[in-house]
């Protein structure tokens, strides 16, 4: 997979993406046949224990992107640019975006926001770094939105999102994530762009879909977004496995005969 092949899939075959944050899950996700892996800044609230994405740092993202690359050497990997890694200046944005390719082995970066960042995106792309855009609910701006709210509900909001999407396309992004955009608006945007849209909570008519791996696997039993589907219950499976281990040790059932070394072997 590369940027050109990714773009060519628009309207032909649904694009499948998932997040991954470490080498083990990167290997699983890649072997399962996803088209691209996103090392999301959702690392912060899915792995590092924070309540939202804002605390993720460049060093966090670089380190985990490196791990994902080690786990999936042949995968198409997109790395999220964390909060304040590109907002302060275009120079800093280019420098930080370049680190993901040079140090971490990413193929592209993703950044949130619309036309306000067009100049920054243009500079990053002209520096040889592919950029994926992100519109709709942009979690790094959750304090501006006043919460995690569905976007694009009215005609005015839908028109605004389309204009922003076209601005990103003109700036040079190769694809756009649409997050928590009402299905009708996401469909309209998808039909009016020449680049693929990747939906997360944005209905059935985007060019592709992405989910957070933790949601898909059921790793957080107390939370599941409306737009996600839980394909497993890994938290409960893991909990039962650890409970069985605790019980075996406490009741002298582990180690088993086959787990011990003996003299003369």
From Swiss-Prot:
Broad class of the protein's primary localization: cytoplasm
Residues annotated as binding Mg(2+): 41, 80, 112
Catalytic activity line of the entry: 3-methyl-2-oxobutanoate + (6R)-5,10-methylene-5,6,7,8-tetrahydrofolate + H2O = 2-dehydropantoate + (6S)-5,6,7,8-tetrahydrofolate
Pathway listed: Cofactor biosynthesis; (R)-pantothenate biosynthesis; (R)-pantoate from 3-methyl-2-oxobutanoate: step 1/2
Active site residues according to the UniProt entry: 179
Domain of life: Bacteria
MF terms in GO: 3-methyl-2-oxobutanoate hydroxymethyltransferase activity; magnesium ion binding
Enzyme class: transferase
Binding residue positions for 3-methyl-2-oxobutanoate: 41-42, 80, 110
GO BP term, example: pantothenate biosynthetic process
GO cellular component, one term: cytoplasm
Cofactor(s) listed: Mg(2+)
UniProt keyword annotations, A-Z: Cytoplasm, Magnesium, Metal-binding, Pantothenate biosynthesis, Transferase
EC number: 2.1.2.11
Cofactor binding: number and manner: Binds 1 Mg(2+) ion per subunit.
Compartments where located: Cytoplasm
HAMAP family named among the record's database cross-references: PanB
Subunit structure: Homodecamer; pentamer of dimers.
Family: Belongs to the PanB family.
Job description of the protein: Catalyzes the reversible reaction in which hydroxymethyl group from 5,10-methylenetetrahydrofolate is transferred onto alpha-ketoisovalerate to form ketopantoate.
Protein name, entry field: 3-methyl-2-oxobutanoate hydroxymethyltransferase
């Amino acid at each position: 997979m590369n940027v050109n092949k990714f773009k060519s899939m628009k309207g032909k075959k649904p694009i499948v993406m998932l997040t991954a944050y470490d080498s083990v899950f990167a290997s699983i996700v890649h072997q399962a046949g996803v088209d691209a892996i996103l090392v999301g800044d959702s690392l912060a609230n899915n792995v590092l224990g924070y309540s939202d994405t804002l605390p993720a740092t460049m060093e966090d993202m670089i380190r985990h992107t490196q791990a994902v690359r080690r786990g999936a050497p042949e995968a198409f990997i997109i790395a999220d640019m964390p909060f304040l890694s590109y907002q302060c200046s275009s120079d800093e944005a280019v420098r930080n975006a370049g680190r993901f390719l040079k140090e971490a082995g990413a193929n592209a970066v993703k950044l949130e926001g619309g036309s306000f960042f067009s100049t920054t995106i243009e500079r990053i792309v002209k520096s040889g770094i592919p950029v994926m855009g992100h519109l709709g609910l942009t979690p790094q701006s959750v304090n501006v939105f006043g919460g995690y709210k569905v976007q694009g509900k009215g005609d005015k909001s839908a028109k605004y999102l389309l204009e922003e999407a076209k601005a990103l396309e003109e700036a040079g992004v190769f694809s756009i994530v649409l997050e928590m955009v009402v299905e009708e608006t996401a469909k309209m945007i998808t039909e009016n762009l020449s680049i693929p849209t990747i939906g997360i909570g944005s209905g059935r008519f985007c060019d592709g879909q992405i989910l957070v791996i933790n949601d898909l696997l059921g790793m957080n039993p107390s939370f599941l977004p409306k737009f996600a589907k839980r394909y497993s219950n890994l938290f409960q499976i893991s909990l039962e496995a650890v409970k069985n281990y605790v019980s075996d040790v406490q009741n002298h059932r582990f180690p088993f005969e086959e787990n011990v070394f003996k003299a003369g072997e």
